A protein has these predicted regions:
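N-terminal, Lys/Arg-enriched amphipathic/low-complexity engagement segments
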Residues: 1-48, 98
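Short, well-structured beta-strand-loop connectors
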Residues: 50-63, 82
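Conserved hydrophobic positions within beta-strands
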Residues: 78-80
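Acidic low-complexity segments
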Residues: 87-144, 155, 211
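Gly-rich Lys/Arg/Thr-decorated short loops/hinges at beta-loop-alpha junctions or inter-strand turns
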Residues: 107, 138, 161-175, 303
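Histidine-anchored nucleotide/phosphate-binding helix
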Residues: 180-196
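Hydrophobic alpha-helical positions that pack around
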Residues: 199-318, 324-331, 339
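Ferredoxin-type iron-sulfur electron-transfer modules in oxidoreductases and energy-metabolism complexes
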Residues: 357-373, 383, 387-461
Length: 461
């Protein structure tokens, strides 16, 4: 039987899941946590603490800066040492709250026990409030505030919840370990999300290269169904191994056979997609009163002798993580935050983890070497590989000459930055790097036009 997958494009990089057998281990607490106020899509959070304040783990330290924004909490207990710009992994200044750790004292009311809670409250408004107050964001890469995603605009209706367990990015295994080690919590979190969305059907999508997770989640669902009807309507769907199967729009295409239009949101076709890590965080927030103060990330690479999946407090310096695992080996010449397809090079190892940090990948000179760039030979391989149906060879040309109007007309803003074009190019053209710049220009033009239209409408009132 053919396994479902998306309809256009895609590539088949080696999965390189060399850390898949590494159980999640807690990372030792950092001496200081550096917690950025901009670590989600939307407006940065606004600090609500001052230098010298004493804080506990789980205490709110920054509040949402707008409708699309999220609470941020102290990930360690101690004293607020500074609130100032600090370099992120690219070296850019980001407003950051520094907390010097003193012990590990948590806010009252947070349940840190291993006791599994299966009873889901009926009050959806209270559930949404806990998700909002817990600072829960999407942990599949986009870090979109979850409470906003669960509140569709008027006229929109969710028809299916998709829990994304594909983890198609090579090397990453934190979601796989989450499914194996916290499968019950993930399914309960999915049931909570399902209830908030009106009891819609729920599909847990897992790629075929994770048979242990597929079997385990199936068993968990069957067991929980016997306890409560709230777990009815949740199913596992085994997906074809293909990159980027875990892309939001690609997953909707594969599961629901619906295409999200240019500039549209998944809810426009009746879909809401949440990552397995987000489902786990929702369980913690709603049933354990635990805000999002830590996340699991993979540390890996063929040149790295100490493969690991670590539970890391938000704001832990990247350098501390690597030193905990023995330091950077001599043959490693580059550290990537994320995977090899969509990740970004780390220019500053003193940068700290964010809520959405998924991996640290160490690469050798041979792995990072790019062939000499040649001229485009018009082979069309990049267009064949693009899962969004774009023409990367054209977009890179328009980006080079700075034609923003043409970039927008050719849907540069729809690029999901998956890297399939770069992976497929025989001329070694850095398509993704160039298109990213053009996409940023197109998005800026779209935002400026929307702001101008809004201002004109306000003035006309």
């Amino acid at each position: 039987m053919r396994k479902p997958t998306f309809s256009i494009g895609g590539v088949h990089p080696h999965d390189s899941k060399i850390s898949r057998e590494c159980r999640v281990e807690p990372m030792p607490l950092p001496d200081s946590a550096y917690i950025a106020v901009a670590q989600h899509i939307g407006a940065p959070a606004k600090p609500i603490v001052a230098v010298g304040d004493k804080v506990k783990v789980g205490q709110p330290i920054a509040e949402p800066g707008g409708f699309v924004s999220a609470f941020i909490h102290a990930s360690v207990s101690g004293t607020v040492k500074s609130i100032a710009p600090r370099a992120d992994l690219a070296g850019n200044p980001v407003m950051t709250i520094e907390i010097a750790r003193e012990g590990d004292e948590w806010m009252e009311g947070i349940d840190l026990s291993d006791t599994l809670v299966t009873e889901i409250p009926d009050d959806n408004k209270a559930i949404l409030d806990k998700i909002r107050l817990g600072g829960i964001v999407g942990l599949g890469g986009a870090t979109f505030p979850t409470h906003v995603k669960l509140s569709p605009p008027p006229g929109s209706k969710c028809e299916r919840l998709i829990i994304n367990g594909c983890e198609c990015e090579p090397y990453l295994t934190s979601d796989f370990r989450c499914l194996l080690e916290k499968g019950e919590q993930v399914v309960i979190g999915a049931a909570i999300l399902k209830q908030v969305l009106g009891g819609v059907p729920c599909t847990v999508a897992i790629e075929e290269n994770k048979p242990e997770a597929i079997a385990h989640i199936g068993e968990v669902i069957a067991r929980l169904r016997k306890q409560s009807p709230k777990f009815d309507g949740i199913e596992v769907m085994v997906m074809k191994m293909r990159y980027p199967q875990g892309g939001e729009k690609q997953l909707i295409d594969a599961v629901m056979h619906r295409q999200v239009g240019s500039g549209a949101l998944p809810i426009s076709v009746g879909a809401v997609v949440q990552n397995v890590g987000t489902a786990l965080a929702v369980y913690d927030a709603v049933l354990k009163n635990k805000p999002l103060v830590d996340n699991t990330l993979t540390v890996t690479g063929e040149c790295f002798p100490h493969q690991a999946n670590l539970l890391v407090r938000v704001g832990t310096p990247l350098r501390a993580i690597l030193e905990h695992l023995g330091g950077i080996p001599d043959e490693a010449v580059k550290v990537i935050s994320g995977g090899p397809m969509m990740g970004k090079a780390v220019a500053n190892l003193d940068a700290a983890t964010l809520k959405g940090t998924s991996a640290l990948l160490l690469l050798t000179e041979k792995q990072t070497a790019r062939g000499e760039e040649g001229p485009c030979i018009r082979c069309g391989k990049c267009a064949e590989a693009c899962p969004m149906g774009l023409e990367p060879f054209l977009l890179q040309k328009l980006s080079r000459i700075g034609d923003v109007e043409a970039l927008e007309a050719n849907a540069a803003q729809d690029c999901i930055e998956c890297g399939c074009c770069l992976y497929s190019c025989p001329a070694n053209i850095p398509l993704l790097d160039i298109i990213r710049l053009g996409k940023a220009d197109a998005m800026k033009a779209i935002r400026e036009r929307a702001a101008a239209a809004k201002a004109a409408a306000e003035a006309a009132k």
